Amino acid sequence: MKILIVGSGGREHALAWKAAQSPQVEQVFVAPGNGGTASEPGVENVAIAADDIAGLVEFARRESIGLTIVGPEAPLVLGLVDAFAEAGLPCFGPRQASAQLEGSKAFAKDFLHRHGIPTAAYGVFTELEPALAYLRQVGAPVVVKADGLAAGKGVILADDLATAEAAVHDMLGGGRFGRAGARVVIEEFLTGEEASFIAMVDGRHILPLASSQDHKARDDGDRGPNTGGMGAYSPAPIVTPEIHDRIMREVMEPTVAGLAAEGLPYLGFLYAGLMIGADGTPKVLEFNCRLGDPETQPLLMRLQSDLVELCLAALDGRLDQVTADWDARPALGVVMAAGGYPDDYETGHVISGLDAVPSSEAKVFQAGTRCEGDAILTNGGRVLCVTALGANVAEAQHLAYQAVDRIQWTDAFCRRDIGHRAIARERS
């Protein structure tokens, strides 16, 4: 079977790497891919953009692709899965109408409210003055979110009213994030510990994947601006068996049932970004209609089951008949980024040391990279995700940073404390 992975990030490198391990697979194509997928055994890049829906359909038809897995959110929101379905091509991901769950934060919040699924109190605004009046009413700290897709950067955690008002002015008055910021969600600032809960859904049945925890803030100690994610680990100790059951019962099951009841049956990866309160109550911060990045990298390091078989089972509506098996060892991934990220940064720097990382120590998933001759060059903000397994989170962290320290390019940086919460739990 031939497989097509859509996207160009570290998540897509991990998906291609895992799909190529399936005994059912003869060839994996990645459109457009990156420097890492270009050199992955059994994997080939295809020069088609992730949002070129007609081009992807034509390629999949021509190559008789047996399964397409969509990595990023933008093609889903543009209707890629709908186009593949019309062409009779198997594609794992939600249709455009269901992908509104990620494509519009206002849609997601209203959906949660309709179905009684726990989330933060909120207001939705398209006009500046009512938004500012609401801010003055609720006070700070508060969270300001662009309604549409903003590459993980459209969320402002405001500790004071001035920061919140500036964010609202930027979005509704200044055009920051363009159409994505033409409507804003202002919501209650929740406290607790974050966790990422990702499942596969076939329309009715839910197959939960292992838990994970992302690190959104750019700097150590969870400081600095929000990013697409600076590292992740799996499993997340905060998600105990009891909390896992609560998440399934209070969040995932009513979400899937609610979508079906509204005529939006959901098929694909469904990611709930959660805040776990001190009493164990899970509240939804956001939904993503795809795997998280960088959570995918440690998750797929741990997944022992055949990813392709799981996707095919979902397309057949039989996720209730399969299981996902996991390596008991934790995995941890550290994102190496370009200096200046998530703001302005340079590309085109040569990366050295990739060959110095032994495969027994870590796996380097490439994201913002490209090939030029024999060299790998930086080509984005988040450049690599260096991922390792360990007997515990502390060992996985040690091995990941040992590998990170072998890799260099001009102005590379990373957080040095990925996994700190889990390690504190291990030591307590």
Swiss-Prot record:
<dbReference type="Pfam" id="PF02843">
    <property type="entry name" value="GARS_C"/>
</dbReference>
<dbReference type="InterPro" id="IPR016185">
    <property type="entry name" value="PreATP-grasp_dom_sf"/>
</dbReference>
<dbReference type="GO" id="GO:0005524">
    <property type="term" value="F:ATP binding"/>
</dbReference>
<keyword id="KW-0460">Magnesium</keyword>
<comment type="similarity">
    <text>Belongs to the GARS family.</text>
</comment>
<dbReference type="InterPro" id="IPR020561">
    <property type="entry name" value="PRibGlycinamid_synth_ATP-grasp"/>
</dbReference>
<dbReference type="GO" id="GO:0046872">
    <property type="term" value="F:metal ion binding"/>
</dbReference>
<feature type="binding site">
    <location>
        <begin position="135"/>
        <end position="196"/>
    </location>
    <ligand>
        <name>ATP</name>
    </ligand>
</feature>
<feature type="binding site">
    <location>
        <position position="288"/>
    </location>
    <ligand>
        <name>Mg(2+)</name>
    </ligand>
</feature>
<dbReference type="Pfam" id="PF01071">
    <property type="entry name" value="GARS_A"/>
</dbReference>
<feature type="domain" description="ATP-grasp">
    <location>
        <begin position="109"/>
        <end position="316"/>
    </location>
</feature>
<feature type="region of interest" description="Disordered">
    <location>
        <begin position="211"/>
        <end position="235"/>
    </location>
</feature>
<keyword id="KW-0464">Manganese</keyword>
<protein>
    <recommendedName>
        <fullName>Phosphoribosylamine--glycine ligase</fullName>
        <ecNumber>6.3.4.13</ecNumber>
    </recommendedName>
</protein>
<dbReference type="InterPro" id="IPR020560">
    <property type="entry name" value="PRibGlycinamide_synth_C-dom"/>
</dbReference>
<dbReference type="InterPro" id="IPR000115">
    <property type="entry name" value="PRibGlycinamide_synth"/>
</dbReference>
<keyword id="KW-0547">Nucleotide-binding</keyword>
<dbReference type="Pfam" id="PF02844">
    <property type="entry name" value="GARS_N"/>
</dbReference>
<keyword id="KW-0479">Metal-binding</keyword>
<keyword id="KW-0658">Purine biosynthesis</keyword>
<feature type="binding site">
    <location>
        <position position="286"/>
    </location>
    <ligand>
        <name>Mg(2+)</name>
    </ligand>
</feature>
<feature type="compositionally biased region" description="Basic and acidic residues">
    <location>
        <begin position="213"/>
        <end position="223"/>
    </location>
</feature>
<dbReference type="GO" id="GO:0006189">
    <property type="term" value="P:'de novo' IMP biosynthetic process"/>
</dbReference>
<dbReference type="InterPro" id="IPR011054">
    <property type="entry name" value="Rudment_hybrid_motif"/>
</dbReference>
<dbReference type="InterPro" id="IPR020559">
    <property type="entry name" value="PRibGlycinamide_synth_CS"/>
</dbReference>
<dbReference type="InterPro" id="IPR037123">
    <property type="entry name" value="PRibGlycinamide_synth_C_sf"/>
</dbReference>
<keyword id="KW-0436">Ligase</keyword>
<dbReference type="InterPro" id="IPR020562">
    <property type="entry name" value="PRibGlycinamide_synth_N"/>
</dbReference>
<dbReference type="GO" id="GO:0004637">
    <property type="term" value="F:phosphoribosylamine-glycine ligase activity"/>
</dbReference>
<comment type="pathway">
    <text>Purine metabolism; IMP biosynthesis via de novo pathway; N(1)-(5-phospho-D-ribosyl)glycinamide from 5-phospho-alpha-D-ribose 1-diphosphate: step 2/2.</text>
</comment>
<keyword id="KW-0067">ATP-binding</keyword>
<dbReference type="GO" id="GO:0009113">
    <property type="term" value="P:purine nucleobase biosynthetic process"/>
</dbReference>
<dbReference type="InterPro" id="IPR011761">
    <property type="entry name" value="ATP-grasp"/>
</dbReference>
<dbReference type="InterPro" id="IPR013815">
    <property type="entry name" value="ATP_grasp_subdomain_1"/>
</dbReference>
